[in-house]
Regions:
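Conserved Lys-Pro-Asp/Glu-containing loop-to-beta segment of HAD-superfamily phosphomonoesterases
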Residues: 332-353, 359
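Substrate-recognition/cap helix-loop segment adjacent to the acidic, metal-dependent catalytic center
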Residues: 297-323
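Basic, amphipathic juxtamembrane/active-site segments
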Residues: 254-279, 364-372
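A conserved beta-strand-loop-helix scaffold within acyl/acetyltransferase catalytic domains
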Residues: 431-511
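Substrate-recognition element of Asp-dependent hydrolases with the DxDx(T/V) motif
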Residues: 276-307, 359, 455-460, 464-465, ...
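Extracellular glycan-modifying ectodomains
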Residues: 1-242, 249-250, 255-261, 354, ...
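Terminal substrate-recognition subdomain of acyl/acetyltransferases
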Residues: 338, 360, 364-426, 529-594
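Acyl-donor binding region in acyl/amide transferases
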Residues: 484, 490-567
Length: 594
């Protein structure tokens, strides 16, 4: 919904929140359901109302537990029967500088301020440890906005007795805690309040009248930032940028002005703007976001523009380049198909409002931000939080290279008339083995991102995955696939629970990067072999349909399983006898971890 995309009208959202919610709930979208506990050190009702709108727009339907006013610490540390029975999927702790127990006094010594700092950190760490111990779910914790006043002026920043200094120390300690604890995230209200304007954010009347830790008009900005973290935790990030060229990556029209006539580089102020935007996009690419081009241009001109010596993005930085005179919505469909990702994983950037309108109308799940002034391009993309990072792995760093290698594989496939011969030619080698601690973060990340080849779409938090890893009643497999063109990284995960003489498959997923390579057969062979080694007789598989996983509806049937039941919603149960099972993998050499 456009009204909920950055930049939004906060006043309109606050006024129309009920009608917007009705529209979202009646739009026919399929959403994942999540339970979110909000433990507040100040009033949280309007925050929850606004957060709900942004999450619904992201494809998440939340239900909320809301603590009583300023009971956040007690609920977490001493327990709460209602919160326990709610069994949250995620906990958000909403505190602000109003919840700092005590600030240093101007008469305190360095030793006294250090002791006060340690006391404050112990207060929060005790709460976080109790939450982890009791609820085993992701936690989002606000850091602190800057104080409303500086008693010592600029000295507040470096004097140990200054409030600014004390808050900065706490924020650094909060960040260090998040860096060393999985599934713990910081909602950076220090940054959000600075962007909004600290004087407006900290308007005292909202606290004294209503116990709001921020002014009410700032709540949509706060909720939007928080929602970005939550949607990332639950696998709703975008994956790729689709970029126009003329007046988007450079100033001017390369086909009319020539390469020498476009604006990019240090010679003009607008050239500097476009050069800075290209550098920003390069940084985004380095985080694992895929870059593609969709431009109405002759390909020769497009490539010439991308090879401009003052530009930092070159043709090799893009996985796909669609430079032709076809309608852009058709090209974007082809890009999604070529990358093997959903259209809802794409963000389209174009300076032309007519092109944006056409793509929005024809491809409503593609994100199309308003790109009005080149000077604002970075801010619009960055503040839209399309690519919020809550987990980061070495595979993310290599994603663009992996997809480019896929393009080379596709080119080689075209040379073969026999698909089996093509698979043989790839010289594929897979490592399939039990989980390793070093891979748990990547495995958890995959469970929250893979949607197409995912039979149950069960999601796991890091804590839940660690429980599975420690439980001998599970058979766990990760699969890593490499071939002569490169290493695809960890691409498949299977988790099966032993029940008597049966293995129930709780989770089976595979990255779309390796579809149609027969990796699923290699995983199945390994799974059945391990099940037989444990004396099991039957493997039972489950398929739960979603809007995105229809491609695996008959996977178990293709494997030779027998369908034993199907309900009115299309949920199916399948069984395979291990007696006489014959291996199915023909093309992949399988190794165990060395």
């Amino acid at each position: 919904m456009k009204e909920l995309e950055y930049p939004f009208d906060s006043g309109y959202l606050l006024k129309k929140k009920r009608s917007i919610k009705r529209l979202l709930l009646s739009d026919g979208s399929v959403r994942i359901k999540k339970k979110i506990a909000v433990l507040g050190g100040s009033t949280t009702n309007d925050i929850i109302n606004m957060l709900e709108l942004f999450l619904l727009n992201y494809g998440i339907e939340p239900t909320f537990y809301e603590s009583e006013y300023n009971r956040y610490w007690q609920d977490a540390v001493f327990g709460n029967e209602e919160l326990d029975s709610f069994s949250p999927d995620l906990i958000f702790v909403h505190t602000s500088n109003r919840n700092i127990l005590k600030y240093p006094a101007i008469t305190d010594s360095k030793e006294q301020t250090d002791a006060l700092f340690a006391e404050q950190m112990k207060y929060f760490e005790t709460m976080w440890e109790k939450i982890a111990e009791r609820y085993h779910c992701p936690v989002i914790q606000n850091n602190f906005e800057q104080p409303y006043f500086r008693l010592m002026g600029n000295r507040d920043a470096f004097d140990c007795r200054g409030r600014v200094n004390f808050i900065n120390r706490l924020n650094t300690a909060f960040a260090d805690y998040a860096a060393s604890h999985e599934s713990f995230y910081i909602n950076d209200i220090n940054y959000v309040s600075a962007c909004y304007g600290l004087d407006k954010w900290s308007e005292p009347s909202y606290w004294h009248l209503y116990k709001y830790a921020m002014c009410v008009p700032a709540i949509p900005d706060f909720a939007f930032n928080l929602a970005a973290i939550i949607k990332s935790v639950f696998g709703k990030n975008k994956k790729a940028l689709v970029l126009d060229l003329d007046n988007t990556l450079w100033g001017g029209v390369v086909g009319d002005d020539g390469v020498d006539g476009i604006e990019i580089g240090q010679e003009t102020h607008m050239g500097q703007v476009y050069a800075e935007f290209q550098k920003y996009l390069g940084l985004v690419k380095d985080t694992g976001v895929m870059l593609t081009v969709c431009s109405k241009n002759d390909e020769e001109n497009a490539l010439a523009g991308l090879n401009h010596p003052e530009g930092s993005l070159k043709p090799d930085d893009f996985i796909m380049i669609k430079a032709n005179w076809d309608n852009k919505d058709r090209n974007i469909e082809a890009i999604a198909a070529g990358l093997n990702i959903g259209q809802d994983a794409l963000v389209f950037l174009d300076d032309n409002p007519a092109e944006r309108a056409i793509v929005s109308a024809q491809l409503p799940t593609v994100a199309v931000p308003e790109m009005e002034r080149p000077e604002d391009y970075i801010r619009v993309v960055d503040r839209s939080r399309f690519f919020e990072i809550t987990a980061f792995s070495s595979d993310d760093l290599k994603r663009n290279e992996m997809y480019k290698e896929n393009a080379v594989r596709a080119a080689q496939q075209a040379q073969f008339t026999d698909y089996g011969e093509y698979l043989h030619s790839l010289e594929m080698v897979a490592v399939i083995d039990d989980f390793l601690p070093v891979y748990l973060s990547r495995i958890t990340q995959l469970t929250n991102k893979s949607n197409q080849f995912n039979l149950t779409t069960k999601r796991f938090t890091t804590a839940e995955m660690e429980q599975v890893f420690a439980d001998d009643s599970y058979i766990r497999l990760y699969g890593r696939l490499a071939d002569k063109f490169g290493d695809n990284g960890i691409v498949s995960v299977v988790i099966g629970k032993v029940n008597g003489d049966t293995l129930d498959i709780d989770l089976w997923l595979m990255s779309c990067r390796v579809l149609k390579r027969d990796m699923e057969y290699a995983m199945l062979d390994n799974l059945c072999d391990r099940a037989k080694q444990r004396g099991l007789k039957t493997v039972k598989g489950y398929y739960y349909p979603t809007a995105k996983n229809k491609m695996v509806k008959e996977l178990y049937g293709d494997f030779g399983f027998t369908k034993v039941s199907e309900d009115a919603d299309g949920n199916t149960v399948w069984e395979l006898s291990l007696s006489g099972y014959e291996p199915k993998n023909k093309y992949i050499t399988v190794e165990r971890n060395k």
